[in-house]
């Protein structure tokens, strides 16, 4: 929770990560990669 961006992004992360693993950033990165492919 220490590398969380501004509150606005923090609200969207859980939805983008779909519960991703470990940290919101990890789930967010994985989701972005999936969308690009």
UniProtKB/Swiss-Prot annotation:
GO terms for biological process: defense response to Gram-negative bacterium; innate immune response. Keywords: Antibiotic, Antimicrobial, Immunity, Innate immunity, Secreted. The keyword Secreted applies. It is found in: Secreted. Synthesized by the fat body and secreted into the hemolymph. Residues 1-37 are annotated as: Disordered. Induction: By injury to the body wall of the larva. Expression peaks at 10 hours post-injury and is maintained at this level for at least 3 days. One of its GO terms (cellular component) is extracellular region. On the 2D-gel the determined MW is: 8 kDa. Acute phase protein with antibacterial activity against the Gram-negative bacteria E.coli (MIC=6.25 ug/ml) and S.sonnei (MIC=12.5 ug/ml). Lacks antibacterial activity against the Gram-negative bacteria P.vulgaris, P.rettgeri and P.aeruginosa, and against the Gram-positive bacteria B.subtilis, S.aureus, M.luteus, B.megaterium, C.bovis and E.cloacae. Belongs to the attacin/sarcotoxin-2 family. This is Diptericin.
């Amino acid at each position: 929770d220490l590398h969380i961006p501004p509150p606005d992004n923090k609200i969207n992360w859980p939805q983008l990560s779909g519960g991703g693993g470990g940290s919101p950033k990890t789930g967010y990165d994985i989701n972005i990669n999936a969308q690009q492919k």
